[in-house]
Design a protein with these regions (language model features):
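Long, contiguous binding/interaction regions
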Residues: 1-52, 56-85
Length: 85
């Protein structure tokens, strides 16, 4: 994996209805960032979808921070796994 300065590796955790939203494309459009998906998995738990995506967020520091702040509003958990400062 080749990261540029400022890129962040982010794990997104989805559950229930949040797994059906087009979050990645929405964040990319609204915050002018590129999001690359490097891993994804979805399972059913008690009949409800539960999933994880490992992504790379690329763009300006401010745009990435704004995108991360908005993720919680979509009932999705974001964890910064690596920050290529």
């Amino acid at each position: 994996m080749n990261l540029s300065k400022g890129d962040k590796v982010i794990q997104l955790s989805f559950h229930g209805e949040s797994s059906g939203h087009a979050l990645v494309s929405k964040l990319s459009r609204e915050y002018n960032i590129d999001i690359s998906i490097i891993y994804g998995n979805i399972e059913m738990l008690d009949g409800k979808p539960l999933g994880k995506l490992v992504t790379i967020f690329s763009g300006s520091h401010n745009d990435i921070e704004k995108a991360l702040a908005s993720i919680g509003e979509n009932n999705v958990k974001a964890e910064v796994m690596y920050d290529a400062q």
